[in-house]
Structures are given as C-alpha cells and as structure tokens.
C-alpha cells in the first residue's frame, strides 16, 4: 500500500523503515508484518485463541525491547476490524497494550506517524 508517494508499507523485507530509489526520487518503505498480525486467526497454523495472540505479541515485544537497548527497533502489528474486533480477540489486544505501556521509551503510533518521523529525521 503506497500513500500518495509519501511511503509504501507493502514490504516484508526488513524490520525498520528504509529508502529505495524510485526513478529520480527516494521512496520510503515502512515494513509490514505477517507474524504479528491478526490475519493469523483466519489461516491454518495461525492463532486459535486470543491468549495465543497475546503471548506471541508479548514475546515479540520482549525480544525487541531487549534488542532495543543497543539500537532502535520497530514492532509492527497488523490489525483488521473484522478479525481483532471480535469479543474474544479484542481482549488480547487490550491486554497487550496494557502490558507494553508499563515500559519506558516506547512509542505506540500509526504507520503514517512512523513515516512522518522517518521522513523528518532520516531523509
């Protein structure tokens, strides 16, 4: 998905945003994820409970937070209203957000905010 030539978020090839050359311009790529994604409720070998989703997100966050002590990290979580919006699933997201907000030096934001930050600081 590309937003008005500002950034694209249809890449899975890295953990942090990066620039590519597009013609004579630079195109910002903001990576997306398939593993920290509620779409796994709808696929084989995916999540079959909110608790599994929560545990996977928590384990991913814990690993990245530890790694982030030496360099910045980004954790993308893919969410779709028709999937995460179910009562048994939304609780796992609320529980995860409650967990991570207890940590210092984290930023919970939208992809567009990441793009704006990257454009401002790393153009």
How would you name each of these model-derived features?
Residues 4-71:
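Active-site-adjacent pocket scaffolds in enzyme catalytic domains
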């Amino acid at each position: 998905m590309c937003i008005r030539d500002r950034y694209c978020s249809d890449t899975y090839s890295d953990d942090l945003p990066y620039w590519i050359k597009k013609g004579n311009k630079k195109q910002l790529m903001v990576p997306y994820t398939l593993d920290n994604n509620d779409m796994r409720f709808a696929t084989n070998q995916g999540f079959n409970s909110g608790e599994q989703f929560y545990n996977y997100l928590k384990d991913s966050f814990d690993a990245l937070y530890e790694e982030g002590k030496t360099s910045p990290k980004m954790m993308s979580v893919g969410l779709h209203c028709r999937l995460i919006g179910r009562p048994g699933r939304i609780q796992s997201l609320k529980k995860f957000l409650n967990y991570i907000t207890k940590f210092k030096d984290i930023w919970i934001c939208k992809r567009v905010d990441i793009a704006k930050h990257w454009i401002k600081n790393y153009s």
